[in-house]
Amino acid sequence: MDVKAASLVDAWNERVRRNPEGRALAYFDGSISAAELDQLSDAFAAALEARGITYGDRIGIQLQNIPQYVIAFLALWKLGAIAVLMNPMYKERELRHLIEDSGARGILADDSLYPATAAAAAGTAVEWILTTSGLEYQRRNDPRIFHSAVPAPSSPDGDMAAWIAEFAGRKPADRTLAHSDVALLAYTSGTTGAPKGAMNTHGNILNVAATCSAWMGLQPGDSVLAVAPLFHITGAVIDAATPLLADTTLVMVNRTDPAVVVDAFAEHQITCTTGSITVFNAIYQVPDAAAAHFASARTLYSGGAPIPPSTVHAFKERFGAYIHNIFGMTETTSAVIGVPPGVQAPVDPASGSLSIGLPLPNVTARIIDAAGNALPFGEQGELELSGPQIVPGYWNNPDATARTMPGGRLRTGDVATMDESGWVYIVDRMKDQINVSGYKVWPREVEDVLYEHPAVYEAAVVGMPDAYRGESVVAYVSLKSGHTATEEELIAFTKERLAAYKYPRSVYVIDDLPKTQTGKIRRRELRKTPKEG
């Protein structure tokens, strides 16, 4: 893969030229060659162009891991348009913020999501909502994934397959793109908890894809399984863009059912994948999973949530496959620190934590003090990162960009140490952000929902260690005088208003929340052993 390619489109065109008949996508029993994928994305790009979509326009994608996601990526990039990653689990209030902030002109959504997506888009700049079905591009209809073999009704605005069929054999106008052009808007959270759109450029993605391809030793004929969701930066870049541009096969299974993932490893002879520790924990619990399923696995990476050494050991003992740590952020276009393939990460003797790895090529990592000065090896400070993977900023948010990326160097907000060999260890987070299975949850957002309940007087949300998810969301509330509310009632209330990974798994009703003399809630005390008041 040539990182010097002018854009992702140029890199993709080179891959098609090298091996047009090579398998680019596998989806259950379906297969799409590079040439076929190129034609499908050409037709979709031409359809979008005919409807006025052009350079710089934003289009939301609200899908699971299905071939249409990749078709849309390539089509939008061919137009110089920007893909806005939208989580299919988002509820109306969450989705509406992404729509309004990005100024999306259109949305490609799963057909089952149309009613909720239409409600979120009402009164915004969205001109149309196009739908598609995960049943397409395969015939197996695995009942573990598909509960019905009949697609949901299409959007009144149209169906993706129909748009592609209408423009079959057509191409969009040629467009010259550069490394600095934005390819993705991937939303993260800022210090206030408000989601911000990180502007992942063609150059950012090319650099990460080229680095990861070389780092993982990807070869033509390898198969990479996308277990990380493509609406997450890791899924979009490492699990999708990297194999697509590296002349390997991207294997997709819609959503992560652990038994389906295990079967896919054997069926498609998976060599590499990157997912959260939750996925690997779930795989470990599959009764029939055996070492034979993972015989082809050469490189397994886990990112998002911390990975305990005991989990790595147990997986290696049972399946013969070692899980490597990898570290990245939306602002770093995914991976920037990782454990080299075939190398076992050291464990910090002081904390017992597994190293997240070494800085990848072209990445500069420093541990700094509050003034931005580099600290000696072994001292704790904030992890700062720089390199061609760092995004140029946040969409329409120069103030947050200046705070988080002064001089183009990313202040991660993570407390870390680095040893003399360059191994990095995460000690703690400077922020209150909660990591649930690799998904980021901000306490304030959950607290705001709790405050909508008529009985809640005060609320505080913290992350608690969870062997399965990495961390779980836990809430503490005090109630208004004369009001009552149960844990079950409050959980149900938040579950209706937040994505599945965001709502609290436990809610403790206590008399008073612990506070400082200035009235700030002492979250550290709440992270101790929970006690009901």
What kind of feature is each model-predicted range?
Residues 358-362, 371-403, 441:
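Conserved ATP/PPi-binding loop(s) of AMP-dependent carboxylate-activating enzymes
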Residues 270-274, 284-350, 364, 374:
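Gly/Ser/Thr-rich phosphate-binding loop
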Residues 90, 107-109, 387, 392-393, ...:
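AMP-binding/adenylate-forming catalytic core of the ANL superfamily
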Residues 21, 151-187, 194, 217-223, ...:
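Conserved pre-ATP/AMP-binding loop-to-beta segment of ANL
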Residues 33-35, 174-175, 183-207:
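Conserved AMP-binding A3 loop
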Residues 116-179:
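ANL superfamily adenylate-forming
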Residues 4, 21-66, 70-74, 91-96, ...:
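Conserved AMP-binding/adenylate-forming core of the ANL superfamily
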Residues 206-223, 231-272, 280, 286:
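Conserved AMP-binding/adenylation subdomain of ANL enzymes
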